[in-house]
Curated annotation (Swiss-Prot):
EC numbers: 2.4.2.29
Pathway the protein takes part in: tRNA modification; tRNA-queuosine biosynthesis
NCBIfam families in UniProt: Q_tRNA_tgt, tgt_general
One GO MF term attached to the UniProt entry: metal ion binding
Role this protein plays: Catalyzes the base-exchange of a guanine (G) residue with the queuine precursor 7-aminomethyl-7-deazaguanine (PreQ1) at position 34 (anticodon wobble position) in tRNAs with GU(N) anticodons (tRNA-Asp, -Asn, -His and -Tyr). Catalysis occurs through a double-displacement mechanism. The nucleophile active site attacks the C1' of nucleotide 34 to detach the guanine base from the RNA, forming a covalent enzyme-RNA intermediate. The proton acceptor active site deprotonates the incoming PreQ1, allowing a nucleophilic attack on the C1' of the ribose to form the product.
Catalysed transformations (reactions): 7-aminomethyl-7-carbaguanine + guanosine(34) in tRNA = 7-aminomethyl-7-carbaguanosine(34) in tRNA + guanine
UniProt cofactor note: Binds 1 zinc ion per subunit.
Active-site residue list: 89, 264
Binding locations of substrate: 89-93, 143, 187, 214
Lineage: Bacteria, Pseudomonadati, Pseudomonadota, Gammaproteobacteria, Alteromonadales
The organism of origin for this protein: Shewanella baltica (strain OS185)
RNA binding, as annotated region: 245-251, 269-273
Protein known as: Queuine tRNA-ribosyltransferase
Length: 374
């Protein structure tokens, strides 16, 4: 992978990630394909929304279908018929989400399979081996996602163990002679000094990119913004910056304003299945009865397949009848909305008009522009 930085506007960055399988324009949003599919979508449909890269889930793909089946197909690209770049998370966040049914030790994590209750052990080395089998273009280190709330001492111990796991991840990645890219993950909770220590340790090890983890886990939005404003300028400028698991459209805007290059989140797809649709004027809840006889499209400013062909009344009808097509059309729209937002942000950075773009974004939704802390 090669990262090119073209231009900046304030702290926002316009660039691209160049892989053998294709180029990803940044800032970029990555749709989430947990089980090797963006729910309800064919790869061609996802690509048509403007997506250059997908995120796959190491933990779930390890449990089902498993490494052996993946290797028989070649890798995840061949298995799911997506021949463009794929980033896979390490499984650390999914293990964190298991709560009481997992035990974290220095060696790794012991837990019971949420599928059949089988005892399973996952450590940095195994995570690297799974992602090698997946053929991930971007591999994420295995880390512990620091919970919120956490005391500074708890956050420090978690962050320092993640640093030790980062070293083990790097060593195993190198031992496997994996030709792809490996990203480190900055932890430390809401504590700036711990974030500093984490980043320094990761830079000393050396990675192809740096992710900010452990945000959007329940902390106040102001803390997320504060940590991003503090840590992003310290990340080496020639490396991509990835904000994991974020988020709402306004979170993407605020992340870009603070120098983030990459995002992922299940929100556009999950919300689509629940009838929450993002538009240029805010969220539409298609299940509301007022859409029953509305012949207008979801968003007159959207060029997606759904908006060009179907009315709000039709989408309301599909939702009320629990038709699968409704969820699919909603998903196409939400994914395209996110990609159009990223296209707009990239264009604004290129032309030095990001402030105006951000102001228009919030004005159209009847909201004030959040201030940058620094």
């Amino acid at each position: 992978m090669k990262f090119e930085l073209d231009t900046t506007d304030g702290r926002a960055r316009r660039g691209r990630l160049i892989f053998d399988r294709g180029t990803v324009e940044t800032p970029a949003f990555m749709p989430v394909g947990t089980y090797g599919t963006v729910k309800g979508m064919t790869p061609e449909e996802v690509r048509a929304t403007g997506a250059d890269i997908l995120l796959g889930n190491t933990f779930h793909l390890w449990l089902r279908p498993g490494e052996e089946i993946m290797r028989k197909h070649g890798d995840l690209h061949d298995f799911m018929n997506w021949q463009r770049p794929i980033l896979t998370d390490s499984g650390g966040f999914q293990v964190f989400s298991l709560g009481d049914i997992r035990k974290i030790t220095e060696e790794g994590v012991h837990f019971r399979s949420p599928i059949n209750g089988e005892k399973i052990f996952l450590d940095p080395e195994k995570s690297m081996q799974i992602q090698d089998a997946l053929g991930s273009d971007v591999v994420m280190i295995f880390d512990e996602c620091t919970p919120y709330p956490a005391t500074e001492d708890e956050a420090r111990k978690s962050m320092q163990m993640s640093l030790r796991w980062a070293r083990r991840s790097r060593d195993e990645f190198d031992r496997l002679e994996n030709p792809n890219s490996l990203f480190g993950i900055i932890q430390g909770g809401v504590y700036e000094d711990l974030r500093d220590e984490s980043l320094k340790g990761l830079v000393d090890i050396g990675f192809d990119g740096y992710a900010v983890g452990g945000l959007a886990v329940g902390e106040p939005k102001a803390d997320m913004h504060r940590i991003l404003e503090h840590i992003c300028p310290q990340i080496p400028a020639d490396k991509p910056r990835y904000l994991m698991g974020v988020g709402k459209p306004e979170d993407l805007v605020e992340g870009v304003r603070r120098g983030v290059d990459m995002f992922d989140c299940v929100m556009p797809t999950r919300n689509a299945r629940n009838g929450h649709l993002f538009t240029s004027e805010g969220v539409i809840k298609i299940r509301n009865a007022r859409h029953r006889d509305d012949t207008s499209p979801l968003d007159t400013k959207c060029d997606c397949y759904t908006c060009k062909n179907y009315s709000r009344a039709y989408l309301y009808h599909l939702d009320r009848c629990n038709e699968i097509l409704g969820a699919r059309l909603n998903t196409i729209h939400n994914l395209r909305y996110y990609q159009m937002l990223m296209e707009g942000l990239r264009g604004a950075i290129e032309t030095g008009t990001l402030d105006a773009f951000v102001a228009d974004f919030y004005t159209s939704q009847g909201r004030e522009v959040p201030e940058l802390v620094n």
